[in-house]
Amino acid sequence: MVEFCVLFGGASFEHEISIVSAIALKEVLKDQIKYFIFLDENHHFYLIEASNMHSKYFAQIKEKKLPPLMLTHNGLLKNSFLGAKTIELPLMINLVHGGDGEDGKLASLLEFYRIAFIGSRVEASVLSYNKHLTKLYAKNLGVKTLDCILLNEKNRANALDLIKPSFNFPFIVKPNNAGSSLGVSVVKEEKELAYALDGAFEYSKEVLIEPFIQRVKEYNLAGCKIKEDFCFSYVEEPNKQEFLDFKQKYLDFSRTKAPKANIPNALEEQLRENFKKLYNDLFDGAIIRCDFFVIDNEVYLNEINPIPGSLANYLFDDFKTTLENLAQSLPKTPKIQVKNSYLLQIQKNK
């Protein structure tokens, strides 16, 4: 049986969602999770007892006096009256949504300290956290995406002039750097634009404008690469109205099993082929979820979710086996052997 530790929390707008994800994953993996490591908004690490992994505990966590830990090589450092003690960690699951977890900070830190983990590596995190870069990446691979306009604080005042030549009302306003539907809105008329931009700029320094397309079909597909083969979840067709907002995506606790999409085999194969293009080889070591649109029988990438909620376990027929197999197929960074031969040669020639 493979043991795991789960890292969750973080200095992120999705801090609470990460907690919910960790609680949900506990119900799936149960005793396979040896440690729960909580990262607070001040970047302090804490060990949380499994018995405390429930919403009531975290609602009052600021009142708790927990001993902070320090990340070190291969584990965590815990100080006590007997001196410092290293807690060796089993394979870590990065379950920090949004900033810190999905933007590459934690991936960089874990790689630096040589802590083995399941999750997107630095380059994959940085790219997928930026929606505009994701579109450029996808187009370069031959995966279609919706056209967009990128706004920032400098051109924000001229937003309508930039949008009008390309898009009619309604259109979608969304933060460029964000890991969820926070700050996303549909603008149906000109008077709604300023408010929508205010909301989006709260979460990101850049904002994307995309066309809003009526009656678009949306499909989600999760998966990972294990050695040379892909392991896919089934395709989910979200039950939505206009689009999945923050509450629908994250606060629906009944989402233990998602509705399976009733689609032709040919469309499922198209979704899988697009997923493979996006995953290879950038996302090695991670379970990701790709959210697709189907418009006029054409497949478009909506976004790549590098750390889906609870690792999208609800989409897999056998999530535990998938996770255990992935644990045996993680990318390895070769250790550099420093020989100092050049310095020795300098000394020899003196």
Swiss-Prot record:
Pfam families referenced in this protein's UniProt entry, alphabetically: Dala_Dala_lig_C, Dala_Dala_lig_N
Catalysed reactions listed for this entry: 2 D-alanine + ATP = D-alanyl-D-alanine + ADP + phosphate + H(+)
InterPro entries: ATP-grasp, ATP_grasp_subdomain_1, D-Ala_lig_Van_CS, D_ala_D_ala, Dala_Dala_lig_C, Dala_Dala_lig_N, PreATP-grasp_dom_sf
Cofactor(s) it depends on: Mg(2+); Mn(2+)
Compartments, as annotated in UniProt: Cytoplasm
Keywords: ATP-binding, Cell shape, Cell wall biogenesis/degradation, Cytoplasm, Ligase, Magnesium, Manganese, Metal-binding, Nucleotide-binding, Peptidoglycan synthesis
Binding site for Mg(2+) 2: 303, 305
Coiled coil: none
Record EC number: 6.3.2.4
GO cellular component: cytoplasm
Family: Belongs to the D-alanine--D-alanine ligase family.
Function: Cell wall formation.
Name of the protein described by the UniProt record: D-alanine--D-alanine ligase
Lineage, highest ranks first: Bacteria, Pseudomonadati, Campylobacterota, Epsilonproteobacteria, Campylobacterales
